[in-house]
């Protein structure tokens, strides 16, 4: 099959001689963005087309002026640019994540963006699209990546918290997607205690709740306003933080913390932190 209307350029995936790009890494006139992670969603484009959730995530991360113009495109809403018919389909990756489905010259090409086929209670599930060409991300495509059952891992975390009431658990999570999925799965598995958040996680969690994802009782993981010594207050508590904070002095303020990572990848032997939750 000859395809001459889409190609890879230094900016990213270029469609119809630059009429628009998908997830470009350099500023362009018109960009369709699959989701809000920084390696796909960059500031500086003139016109950004994405789901409302992705646009709000970009606004939260980059400020109101992250682009000159933005257009909300709902899932399965039709859009035509230079004779290319376009719609977005759920990708199951994070809130608002989408596949870009393009139809031109009797050819259907789907750009997956990052996607996930496992259940995730915080975003719309991945939707298979019949395509002539499927341009896929392959972050975890190698056979070495074997993910255990997510609910099993969540219950192991809950059991660990219950087994060590004199210690706190500090789990490293990425601020967009991983944090909210972990929290929601904990709630769905019966853990309704307050979860304490590093400051860098708060805004995106609030944004998820704005879009109807109930994350339960969340509080900042501060030490200044606690009624008792932080060492005593945080015993038996669960704290979520970005991975970088686990090796920082920030995590040492807590009582003999058990450190872990909520990761989509495997635990390699050279890692110093255990992967408690592979979700």
Predicted regions and their residues:
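A contiguous, basic/glycine-rich beta-loop/short-helix subdomain that forms a polymer-engagement track
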Residues: 207-263
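His/Asp/Glu-rich metal-coordinating catalytic cores
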Residues: 2-16, 21-26, 30, 38-168, ...
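Structural motif
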Residues: 25, 173-176, 198-199, 240-245, ...
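Conserved adenylation A10 loop of the ANL superfamily
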Residues: 34, 269
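Residue-level preference for the first positions of well-ordered beta-strands
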Residues: 133, 167-170, 194, 236-238, ...
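Hard-cation-handling environments
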Residues: 157-167, 173-180, 184-222, 229
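Short, solvent-exposed amphipathic alpha-helical segments in soluble enzyme
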Residues: 37, 126-128, 185-190, 212-213, ...
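Single conserved hydrophobic/aromatic residue that forms the stacking wall/gate
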Residues: 270-279
């Amino acid at each position: 099959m000859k395809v001459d209307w889409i190609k890879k350029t230094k900016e990213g995936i270029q469609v119809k001689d630059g009429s628009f790009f998908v997830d470009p890494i350099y500023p362009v006139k018109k960009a369709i963005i699959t989701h809000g992670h920084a390696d796909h969603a960059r500031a500086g484009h003139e016109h950004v087309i994405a789901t409302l959730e992705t646009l709000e995530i970009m606004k939260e991360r980059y400020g109101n002026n992250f682009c000159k113009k933005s257009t909300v495109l709902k899932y399965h809403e039709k859009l035509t640019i230079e004779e290319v018919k376009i719609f977005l389909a759920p990708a199951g990756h994070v809130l608002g994540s989408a596949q870009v489905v393009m139809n031109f010259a009797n050819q259907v090409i789907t750009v997956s963006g990052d996607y996930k086929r496992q259940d995730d209670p915080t975003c719309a599930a991945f939707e298979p699209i019949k395509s002539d060409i499927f341009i896929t991300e392959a972050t975890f495509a190698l056979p070495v990546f074997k993910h255990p059952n997510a609910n099993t891992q969540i219950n192991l975390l809950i059991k660990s918290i219950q087994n060590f009431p004199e210690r706190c658990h500090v789990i490293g999570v990425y601020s967009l997607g991983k944090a909210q999925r972990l929290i929601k799965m904990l709630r769905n598995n019966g853990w309704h205690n307050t979860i304490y958040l590093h400051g860098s996680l708060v805004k995106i969690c609030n944004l998820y709740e704005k879009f109807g994802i109930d994350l339960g009782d969340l509080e900042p993981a501060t030490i200044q306003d606690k009624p008792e010594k932080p060492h005593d207050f945080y015993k038996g508590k669960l704290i979520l933080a970005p991975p970088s904070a686990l090796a920082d002095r920030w995590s040492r303020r807590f009582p003999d913390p058990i450190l872990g990572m909520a990761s989509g990848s495997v635990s390699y032997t050279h890692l110093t932190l255990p992967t408690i939750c592979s979700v």
